Amino acid sequence: MKRFDLRPLKADIFERLEELIKKEMQPNEVAIFMFEVGDFSNIPKSVEFIQSKGHELLNSLRFNQADWTIVVRKKA
């Protein structure tokens, strides 16, 4: 399982998220992505983004006051 920190990107996480899934993960591999909560708009957007790409969202939870994590399985 890999862990990727997207917090430095603030709200602009989706391009990097897609790049990491494509290039850094193997099919059926699970990874944890951490990003900054901000105004909470990235939380539902991240769920929709993962599902629209055909990947499986295993978990989505608040990590602390400022950060959120999603656990994703890459599609085969």
Question: Model-predicted segments: where are they?
Answer:
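Amphipathic alpha-helical interaction surfaces in cytosolic regulatory modules
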Residues: E15-I21, D39-L57
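C-terminal edge-of-domain segments
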Residues: G54-A76
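Generic cytosolic/nucleocytoplasmic N-terminal low-complexity/intrinsically disordered segments
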Residues: M1, P44, S52, R73-K74
